[in-house]
Amino acid sequence: MCAQHVADTSEVKWQKVLYERQPFPDNYVDQRFLEELRKNIYARKYQYWAVVFESSVVIQQLCSVCVFVVIWWYMDEGLLAPQWLFGTGLASSLVGYVLFDLIDGGDGRKKSGRTRWADLKSTLVFITFTYGFSPVLKTLTESVSTDTIYAMSVFMLLGHLIFFDYGANAAIVSSTLSLNMAIFASVCLASRLPRSLHAFIMVTFAIQIFALWPMLQKKLKAYTPRSYVGVTLLFAFSAFGGLLSISGVGAILFALLLFSISCLCPYYLIHLQLFKENIHGPWDEAEIKEDLSRFLS
């Protein structure tokens, strides 16, 4: 009987069904059970230099925060005249404005439908209102201690870096929140400057470096990658040099941070790919790829 049962079992082929009785034990595993197993079929194969290139977005924002803090320190110490910063920032904005249109040949402006006259009006309105409210900004936090202002500014700038849009499609990304946190930090720091003119120029500079500068960098990255890399390196060295003039230890730590993000982290990511094991097979959950929006109305 035992030999007959073994013969019957060998003749019957195992089927991957639950609705039919089969002459196999419950813990039986057939050789064909994993024949449809696939590993890492949707895994992205990263290239080291491509990851280094993408990390430049993070480098840009870190350098922006560093440059902003360095400029504020120079103004607070009286080493930088506000008129000089305003003139330099205005000239840089004009150059960036022209480059923004030249990079894509004006296609972006045509698609948005926005005219230069509209841009000029927006700029004049912003400068007028910011200058008018600069005395309010200067005295807004007089009742708050300086240590609290510094702590709030640090947390706001960290939040700006966390929520900034680096190009990832993630729920945590919020460009509006990131910009608002950076502007709030600039208002807090500007309130500790000597005069209302300093506060006005500091907030204006914050708009330039946290709102306008990333827009130009994004377009440079999309249309002229080589120029983008050159600008990123120049910006990083400028931030390092500015920080070095204030604190040698801080500059070294900042350089190590940039090196880790741009070189070590991409290498670690590539190394971790060797251990990636995503399995796929008929046991996966069904994926509905059809557009069902017509049934939701």
From Swiss-Prot:
Its main location: endoplasmic reticulum. It comes from the Eukaryota. It is a multi-pass membrane protein. The chain crosses the membrane at residues 67-87, 88-108, 153-173, 239-259. It is found in: Endoplasmic reticulum membrane. The keyword Endoplasmic reticulum applies. Pathway: Glycolipid biosynthesis; glycosylphosphatidylinositol-anchor biosynthesis. GO terms for biological process: GPI anchor biosynthetic process. Part of the glycosylphosphatidylinositol-N-acetylglucosaminyltransferase (GPI-GnT) complex that catalyzes the transfer of N-acetylglucosamine from UDP-N-acetylglucosamine to phosphatidylinositol and participates in the first step of GPI biosynthesis. Component of the glycosylphosphatidylinositol-N-acetylglucosaminyltransferase (GPI-GnT) complex composed at least by PIGA, PIGC, PIGH, PIGP, PIGQ, PIGY and DPM2. Interacts with PIGQ. Interacts with the heterodimer PIGA:PIGH. This is Phosphatidylinositol N-acetylglucosaminyltransferase subunit C.
